[in-house]
């Protein structure tokens, strides 16, 4: 399983706030993985409770070399629809037609209003 660890996400954020995150993506497979091309996308997941998962494609395009680790920076602006809730936040590689879940440890984050 590809592991995606990240830093830069505080425990409490506000809607409208721009987050600057650093992702460390580990590819354990003997082949490169192309992200943002074909059907594989990097998405940020915000999970609240058992049934709500908001998924936001990052739009990033890159290749993770075989059996290696890649570090990338990125930004995300917290959307108003997330305000007033606490989420488990993480990243996943999504392939069209497949269910996805966190590719790494999620981080609890509370989203407040502006």
Predicted regions and their residues:
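Asparagine-centered strand-capping/turn motif at beta-strand->loop junctions
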Residues: 25-29
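Structural beta-strand segments of beta-rich domains
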Residues: 17-21
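Low-complexity, acidic Ser/Thr/Pro/Gly-rich terminal tails and inter-domain linkers that flank the onset
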Residues: 1-14, 111-114
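Short, surface-exposed loop/turn segments at beta-strand-coil junctions that are enriched for proline
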Residues: 77-84
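Short beta-strand and strand-turn-strand segments in soluble, beta-rich domains
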Residues: 45-61
């Amino acid at each position: 399983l590809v592991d995606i660890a990240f830093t830069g996400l505080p425990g409490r954020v506000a809607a409208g706030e721009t987050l600057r995150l650093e992702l460390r993506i580990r590819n354990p497979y003997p082949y490169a993985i192309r992200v943002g091309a074909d059907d594989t996308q990097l998405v940020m997941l915000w999970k609240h409770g058992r049934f709500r998962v908001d998924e936001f494609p990052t739009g990033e395009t890159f290749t993770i070399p075989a059996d290696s680790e890649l570090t990338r920076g990125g930004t995300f602006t917290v959307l108003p629809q997330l305000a007033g809730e606490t989420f488990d936040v993480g990243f996943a590689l999504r392939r069209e037609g497949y269910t996805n879940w966190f590719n790494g440890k999620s981080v609890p984050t509370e989203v407040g209003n502006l």
